[in-house]
């Protein structure tokens, strides 16, 4: 069965972006191999993102920046109750309930599914038990305040550490499996 994997970078104090969405603190020299991103791209064929992250991508493109092309272009699904009138090529908007969408996609043949973010959509998928793993790259920088990795909720989500890796620039990769409750495991 396909897995839904959050693959993301956070500041050392747990933020994925500044309050205004800026990720300037991510602009830094990267070690050879770009933290294993190439290998990760080979393992996925679908990207999920929330509306705010989609809007960030639109702004990125408007500024004349290009999205790196891959040998195989994954399909992008953005979640929003109010999709925009004009949608970037290669993106579809989803209004379907998350649980229903995830169940349908997990049943299809294919590679793993990349949950790009942001914090709101990650939290929504976690709330219904539909995140399998987190691969978090902790950048050795404090930004003080910003958008948290997961939007605040009153919940506890146990994780099982699968691996760690320290890179030459001080970045640490933490790979976790989300520990499913018995009820979540049965609902699949």
Where are these regions (language model features)?
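Enzymes that bind and transform nitrogen-containing heteroaromatic metabolites
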Residues: 1-188
């Amino acid at each position: 069965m396909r897995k839904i994997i959050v693959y993301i970078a956070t500041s050392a104090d747990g933020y994925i972006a500044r309050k205004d969405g800026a990720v300037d603190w991510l602009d830094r020299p990267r070690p050879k191999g770009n933290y294993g991103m190439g290998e990760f791209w080979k393992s996925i064929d679908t990207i999920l993102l929330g509306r705010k992250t989609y809007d960030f991508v639109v702004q990125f493109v408007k500024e004349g920046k290009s999205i790196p092309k891959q040998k195989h272009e994954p399909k992008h699904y953005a979640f929003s109750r109010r999709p925009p009138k004009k949608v970037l090529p290669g993106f579809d908007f989803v209004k379907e309930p998350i649980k229903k969408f995830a169940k349908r996609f997990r049943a299809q043949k294919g590679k793993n599914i990349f949950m790009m973010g942001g914090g709101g959509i990650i939290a929504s998928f976690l709330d219904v038990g539909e995140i399998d793993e987190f691969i978090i790259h902790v950048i050795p920088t404090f930004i003080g305040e910003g958008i948290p990795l997961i939007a605040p909720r009153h919940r506890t989500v146990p994780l099982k550490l699968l691996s760690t890796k320290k890179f030459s620039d001080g970045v640490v990769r933490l790979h976790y499996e989300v520990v499913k409750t018995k009820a979540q495991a049965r609902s699949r």
